[in-house]
């Protein structure tokens, strides 16, 4: 009886279906070349780990730098690539970015600049790129403290890849916004970099489990005075 059970288990293992396409979509290699989506990304039709996803972040990269011009300023750039998987995901082509801009100019300001975006669609076997026009970008006053950068990517439908980039300049160099490693959409790749001079002290905190950092310990950079 034991031999029969082992034989049956072995046969069931051999007859179990294999899903190579599912494994492929679940393990897409990160393609971080902004402006150059891969054929694999363009041909992607679903996301195996979450088949209900209407869209997915292929990547979201950020980089903060400190610049000096009559005082320090903090700049933070964003590069984003999203794949639209279902018609309901088209709404992610409408982007809103709030930023601090009080009506009292003496309080310091943030501003958004270097805004660009485009969409990619496969048509007759060719990748068609459609850049975002200037008219699609607007700035709206939300309240006496915040403005909102708004823009809409063109020619978006099921199967489209959208990309966009923007840069925030802030007078509040001592305050770095939290970086979200996961959003409401599945995130395939997320990276944040911070470059700062040695005269500025930063403490790095990574709450949560399973985050990969270049150093296991919490870092506290020392200040060097001249």
Regions found by a protein language model. Give the residues of each.
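Bacterial Sec-dependent N-terminal signal peptides
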Residues: 1-26
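Beta-strand-rich, non-transmembrane domain signature
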Residues: 21-226
